[in-house]
Amino acid sequence: MSENIDVQATVTVTFPDGRNMSIPSGSSGYDIAQSIGHSLAREALAIRINGELADLGTAVTDDATVEIITFDHPGATGKHIFWHSASHIMAQAIEELFPGTKFGAGPAVEQGFYYDIASEHRFNEEDLQKIEQQMLDISKRSIDIRREEMPREKAIAFFSESRKDPYKVEILQDTLKEADSVSIYHQGAFADLCSGPHLPNTSKLKAVKLTNISASFWRGDSSRESMQRIYGIAFPSAKLLKQHLARLEEAKKRDHRKLGAELELFMLSQDVGSGLPIWLPKGAIIRSELEAFLKEEQRKRGYVPVYTPHIGNIDLYKRSGHYPYYSDSQFPPLTYKDDLGREEQYLLKPMNCPHHHLIYSSQLRSYRDLPIRMAEFGTVYRHEQSGELNGLIRARGFTQDDSHIYCRPDQLVDEICAAIDLTKFVFTTLGFDDIEVRLSLHDPENQGKYGGTEEVWKQAEKDVREAADRMEINYVIGIGEASFYGPKIDFIVRDALGRKWQLGTVQVDYVMPERFDLSYIGSDGKPHRPVIIHRAPFGSMERFIGVLIEHTAGNFPLWLAPVQVAVLPITEEVHAYAERVHQMLIDNGIRADLDIRSEKIGKKIREAEVGKIPYMVIIGQKEADSEEISLRRHRKGDQGSLTLQALKDMLVKEVRNKS
């Protein structure tokens, strides 16, 4: 007689560190976390199965590699899931407090989340506090967040009839028109169209701060409906929020717009126009020094300078594809009639690239001439939305340290490596030691978004990967983040407050040589296509300097400081000697100011400290008699006495070494 024995099937899961574990088939991400430890189960937010993110409740039914995602997961994956769910919780809170509100897009961003909303109510700071409290109330209700797969046509009916949300209906009928089914997330009476993943339960949210309200447009299109964008950030503990708010306070002190005004670096004026910064003398010195630094380094590395106009014929940008591809972010064409009555249109230059391609094609090139490395600090113009403008960091007129390298295919990987090396050199020289690299590749499922064939893209991406691997840089892959003409290597720096900024870039381009019919004569006597590398270590001078101001809190290294030394005589009797010292510094290339006002030395020192001047030379009768100086360093105080020769040697060496 035999017995039926119920043996539950098991599967093997493999963790990132290589460990294996046998679990019952159908176990959820939460079950797996619980089997590892109660602490991990409490902190678990989602699961990655065979490289794909999924909700924590997703069942594992086959052997798989798995990774439990927590808030502090490397690469900010956990934070983005948490903040994306927080945007849904905020939307639910708004819907409960302000019935009839409609919802556009609500993604996670670098530091938190936002939601674009359509409402007749104009939201204010008092409303934000009410919404915060409602979000915490939703958290206390411990509402399960549930995913539902729904046929697209049924989803259209759901959002049209039940939710009465025209924005979700538009997405379903437009962006998702090819989808057979879509995912919807429910939390209580609230529901949203979303691919997820999301938190398992609203109770994970323990602390929230809504930070800002700004204007926006549906789908970023200024011709569409205006919306209100509410920003916020949330955390799984009150302690983390407190730490974040402390960092925000420090960020306010470092705000480049605040410091830019206090240190007299740049100004913004509505008389000139939004997003068009004006460089004041001290800021112009910083920019000039940075440009000179890169120009000299480029000269050593074989670059040649070029200059191009600020406007160009619209046909040039149609040829390159920048128009109409970037037309939404460009200023309207300038239209006029020539002497024969023919209408011509010009654009404020949105990119430097097409102009450089014309320079290349202006003469016959041989394979022996390549690589040709052109470089220009070229000003370009983009019509950014007013709500997106942010001092120097997001402007409408800005200068790019643009270079285009024209090379043979057999030279390409070497040239990419050299461009990577230059970019890393620039960042480390300027104190950005924490650098991330992202390889931005195209989305093969959306080939129509890009120029060139799939075959060309495969080759370009192969070359970029080979160069990155040869340079031994750690990188992450960003699918769908490439430029329309080629893959790119983006450099993301982390500043003193831990914030990430995308600055430099290196891009490979097989498309523009075709569009501009660029060629060189090969060793076989026949024409061949060059490959182009677009390269900009700073990216935008304005953005880079804005980030640098906040990174250093305005305490620039000596070689960049607008005023490097303040010469501060104590009494009128030593003015003659102070003038001699001042002139000696000027003669040796040091930017020095002489303060001969009849103020007490304490006040002069305080003002120099506030002005963040790196060195203060104090001169009294004792110093004048011995022909020495007393030296103070910003934030470090008294450095003792020095001879004039020792002072000169020290300053010149520090400037030369860019230390």
Swiss-Prot record:
Cofactor binding, note field: Binds 1 zinc ion per subunit.
SUPFAM superfamilies for this protein: Class II aaRS ABD-related (SSF52954), Class II aaRS and biotin synthetases (SSF55681), TGS-like (SSF81271), ThrRS/AlaRS common domain (SSF55186)
Subcellular localization, as worded in the UniProt entry: Cytoplasm
Name of the top EC class for this enzyme: ligase
Pfam families attached to this UniProt entry: HGTP_anticodon, TGS, tRNA-synt_2b, tRNA_SAD
SMART domains: tRNA_SAD
InterPro entries associated with the record: aa-tRNA-synt_IIb, aa-tRNA-synth_II, aa-tRNA-synth_II/BPL/LPL, Anticodon-bd, Anticodon-bd_dom_sf, Beta-grasp_dom_sf, TGS, TGS-like
Positions of the UniProt region annotated as Catalytic: 255-557
Amino acids binding Zn(2+): C353, H404, H534
Cofactor: Zn(2+)
Reaction equation(s) it catalyzes: tRNA(Thr) + L-threonine + ATP = L-threonyl-tRNA(Thr) + AMP + diphosphate + H(+)
GO process terms (BP): threonyl-tRNA aminoacylation
Role description: Catalyzes the attachment of threonine to tRNA(Thr) in a two-step reaction: L-threonine is first activated by ATP to form Thr-AMP and then transferred to the acceptor end of tRNA(Thr). Also edits incorrectly charged L-seryl-tRNA(Thr).
Family statement: Belongs to the class-II aminoacyl-tRNA synthetase family.
Protein name: Threonine--tRNA ligase
Gene: thrS
